[in-house]
């Protein structure tokens, strides 16, 4: 029997839920889909975020009574190799939006394998990459040529 698997929803352990929710909702446009039932915002221990067909869960890394005053840098180092990749047809627009919101990142770059990518880190140090297949100059020339032909055909009909 074939497996019917639909979607995925990663779970990230975060140091400060309010900071993480603010980042994912206010900066990246996610909305809160569900929360734990025994807390009041912004003191949730668990949230389920959704943006279109992208799902992400956040859980506090510590129970409130055991949370240290500041994040342990070793904890961030342990997930330094974790990165969430988001499909973003207009990577430059994502970059501009992040800059408008005061989020620092390097400018998008085209990887050797042809993906235009923008990397940054969330408040807990998890890697985030917004990417899309980069158009080659030849593809852009062909698209422009096809658009001009379409315009010319419409002009001849009118």
Describe every region a protein language model picked out.
Residues 2, 11-56:
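Core segments of cupin and vicinal oxygen chelate
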Residues 1-21, 81-84, 133-158:
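N-terminal beta-strand motif that seeds the catalytic metal site of vicinal oxygen chelate
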């Amino acid at each position: 029997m074939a497996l019917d698997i639909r979607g995925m929803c990663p779970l990230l352990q975060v140091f400060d839920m309010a900071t993480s929710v603010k980042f994912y909702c206010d900066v990246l446009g996610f909305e809160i889909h569900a929360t734990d039932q025994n807390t009041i915002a912004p003191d949730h221990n668990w949230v389920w975020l959704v943006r279109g067909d992208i799902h992400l869960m956040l859980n506090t890394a510590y129970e409130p009574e055991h949370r240290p005053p500041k994040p342990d840098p070793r904890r961030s180092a342990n997930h330094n190799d974790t990165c969430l990749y988001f499909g973003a047809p207009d990577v430059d627009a994502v970059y501009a939006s992040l800059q408008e919101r005061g989020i620092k990142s390097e400018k998008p770059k085209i990887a050797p394998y042809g993906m235009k990518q923008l990397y940054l880190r969330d408040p807990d140090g998890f890697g985030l990459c917004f990417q899309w297949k980069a158009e080659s100059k030849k593809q852009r020339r062909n698209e422009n040529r096809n658009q001009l032909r379409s315009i010319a055909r419409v002009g001849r009909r009118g």
